[in-house]
């Protein structure tokens, strides 16, 4: 299945149904009171995280999703039916962003987590609501309010503990194959990896971590060179980054310069990502003697002024790979992921009584000409129907 990690869709919540103007008409009751019902609320739009999905390909071609409109009110005090909600399933790790305002609406990081992204409109009021002692036959009603509509940007960000960085052909996919059961494509040409992939590295019988491999970066990737830097977003949720460096590049480039290229592109993308713990891992030491590899690495880190720990491995032969995975596991256990507590639902600020009061103040007449069944001569709220003559 094709990997799609971004999608732009149109979301439309349902409009609220309009109120109804109606009067009770039955046998022997030719002039009954008002009986127009309220409209129904519009349907909402939700996102729900589904662990069985791993791509946003479902939203590549189908771009518009609309919830059902609330039905209008009817006579006999019948309230309109509420519009049906729609729920869109997305992979775990999806972020929802308002395309116009760039506001982050929420992150779905757990299976089954649900996010309201468009609220349906509220119902209009029927003329029964406007009945009073001085207005026995109201012809006012209110219209339903529009539902929320927005262009929604969906971004899938993989959930991994460890993220791999490096130039093309640094050996990232080979490392993934060495530490996990994942089988990403490996070849001797650049950009063998075209989409992110995940692998589960097991350390012992009861410990493991998830590692993410992304396509390699090249110089000026932030300006669109190569595959660009768009895949770096998949590393934002990682706890540690592994910067894999080819100690003996085939193009005879300087490994120190190659490290600087990745560092620069990382800062160009996000300072927050660049501030994550990052380990230098020198790969392909099997292409030279141990003494030569050690001397070359020491010369590189001295030029860079790098003072943190670094590692020398061969992903192809597995040399020192087990030691590295144990160190990674120990680091992850010492720095557990900050668990995001489920926030309590916001208190509902919407009050029906307030809404009804405001709606009644902005009511519209069914007819252009105002009409009621009271005459200007009414005295103390009593309409004079017949007055008997003199003696």
UniProtKB/Swiss-Prot annotation:
GO BP terms in the entry: ribosome biogenesis
Keyword Cell wall biogenesis/degradation attached: no
Ligand binding (GTP): 166-173, 191-195, 213-216, 283-286, 314-316
GO molecular function: GTP binding; GTPase activity; magnesium ion binding
Region of interest (Disordered), residue spans: 363-391
Keywords recorded for this protein, A-Z: Cytoplasm, GTP-binding, Hydrolase, Magnesium, Metal-binding, Nucleotide-binding
Cofactor(s) named in the record: Mg(2+)
UniProt domain Obg: residue ranges: 1-159
Keyword Hydrolase belongs to the record: yes
Assembly, per entry: Monomer.
Protein name in UniProt: GTPase Obg
Gene: obg
């Amino acid at each position: 299945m094709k990997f799609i990690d971004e999608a732009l869709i149109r979301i439309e919540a349902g409009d609220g149904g309009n109120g109804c103007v109606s009067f009770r008409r039955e046998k022997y009751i030719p002039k009954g009171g008002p009986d127009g019902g309220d409209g129904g609320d519009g349907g909402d739009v939700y996102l729900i995280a589904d662990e069985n999905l791993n791509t946003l390909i479902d939203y590549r071609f189908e771009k518009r999703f609309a919830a059902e409109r609330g039905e209008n009110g009817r006579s006999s005090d019948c309230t309109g039916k509420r519009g049906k909600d729609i729920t869109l399933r997305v992979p775990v790790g999806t972020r929802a962003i308002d395309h116009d305002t760039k506001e982050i609406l929420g992150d779905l990081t757990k299976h089954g987590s649900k996010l309201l992204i468009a609220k349906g409109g509220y119902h209009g009021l029927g003329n029964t609501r406007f009945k009073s002692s001085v207005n026995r036959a109201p012809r006012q009603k209110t219209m339903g309010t529009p539902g929320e509509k927005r262009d929604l940007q969906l971004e899938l960000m993989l959930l991994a503990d460890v993220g791999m960085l490096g130039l093309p052909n640094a050996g990232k996919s080979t490392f993934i194959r060495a530490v996990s059961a994942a089988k990403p494509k490996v070849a001797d040409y650049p950009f063998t990896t075209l989409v992110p992939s995940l692998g589960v590295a097991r350390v012992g019988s009861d410990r493991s971590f998830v590692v993410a491999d992304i396509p390699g970066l090249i110089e000026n990737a932030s300006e669109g060179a190569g595959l660009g830097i768009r895949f770096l977003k998949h590393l934002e949720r990682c706890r540690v980054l592994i910067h894999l460096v080819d100690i003996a590049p085939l193009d005879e480039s300087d490994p120190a310069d190659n490290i600087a290229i990745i560092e620069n592109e990382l800062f160009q993308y996000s300072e927050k990502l660049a501030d994550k713990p990052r380990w230098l891992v020198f790969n392909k030491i099997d292409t030279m003697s141990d003494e030569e590899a050690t001397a070359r690495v020491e010369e590189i880190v001295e030029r860079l002024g790098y003072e943190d720990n670094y590692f020398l491995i061969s992903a192809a032969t597995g040399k020192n790979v087990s030691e590295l995975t144990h160190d990674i596991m120990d680091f992850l256990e010492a720095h557990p992921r900050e668990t995001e507590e489920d926030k309590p639902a916001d208190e509902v600020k919407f009050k029906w009584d307030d809404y009804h009061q405001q709606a009644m103040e902005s009511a519209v007449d069914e007819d252009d000409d105002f009409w009621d069944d009271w005459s200007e001569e009414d005295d103390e709220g009593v309409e004079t129907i017949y007055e008997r003559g003199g003696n």
